[in-house]
Amino acid sequence: MLEFIIGRAGSGKTTACLNAIKEKLIHSPTGKPLVILLPDHMTFAIERQLALELKDYGGFTRAYVLGMSRLAYQVLMRCGGILHPHLNEIGKELLLSRVLSSTKLSILAKAARQHHFTASVSQIIEEFKTSGISVTTLQDILTLIDNDSLKQKLSDLTSIYAGLDEQMAGRYHDSEDMMELAIKKLPECTWLQDAEIWIDGFDAFNPQHFRVVEQLLALASDIHLTLCINNLNDIEHEAPTALFHRQFNVFQQINNMAKKLAIPTKITTLTKNHRHKQQDLAFIEEQLFKFPLTKKNYTGGLQIVE
């Protein structure tokens, strides 16, 4: 079963996830894994919060607080696949510097001498990899481009990308390579078979992450996905410039995955605002991007300082 937990900011989505995990751990300390999947920067705070809430119950062994990168590492550690040392961002930039010194560039030759160029190229290559764009794909695209300037830029990027691949082949893998390996290993990962998974804190996924979620849908017994959006039926969300378009896009794509896999879905909507104790703050949060403007009597909850 796939459950979408939706609500505005401060409506208690993360708390609902933690309370559900806590209840299951108290009722049954052992059993199938309970996984809460978060953006990497949230994992420490949420794991600490969960540990504090369970300190009177002796901690936990079946609950896992993971980011996407840590999930990939766990899958590869348990199911095999880690063959080469991991290359971090600094290491990748050093390799790129070596590639740039030995690669003949055309239109990007001057830019390549600028400070932070390697960091920019590293980010571009990361986006290529997360989107499933290989060197071969770029080479095929080059044959279809008529604009000379664009073609030269893409040709330079392709040469750099190919050079980095050559330097890393059989020696290192980066986070994107690790994620790709994990996606391939997930179907045979018995560790997550029939696990219960909560996915919280994301407002968007890159293409690799969508593929991870699709694999998890096929493996897990239940998945609960939180989205910071208050109404899935509002057609305004379909506009690319809409405030909650990214969250709505996540809902649509993952809902379609569930339909394809014949997985039942449900939607839980949280409406109470737990974050804003002052009525004026809650009103601004609710009405900030709404038109026409709505007026409200001032109750003393805000001060404007100039």
Descriptions of predicted regions:
Residues 5, 16-21, 49-50, 99, ...:
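Structural preference for long, well-ordered alpha-helical segments in enzyme cores
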Residues 36-38, 65-66, 198, 222-227:
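Structural recognition of the conserved hydrophobic beta-strand(s) that form the central parallel beta-sheet
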Residues 2-5, 102-201, 212, 237-239, ...:
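Accessory N-terminal region flanking or inserted into the helicase ATPase core
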Residues 42, 203-204:
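Catalytic acidic motif of RecA-like/P-loop NTPases
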Residues 210-305:
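Conserved RecA-like helicase ATPase core segment
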Residues 1-51:
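Glycine-rich P-loop/Walker A and Walker A-like loops and their local beta1-loop-alpha1 context
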Residues 30-33, 58-63, 193-194, 220-223, ...:
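Short glycine-/polar-rich loops that comprise or flank the Walker A/P-loop
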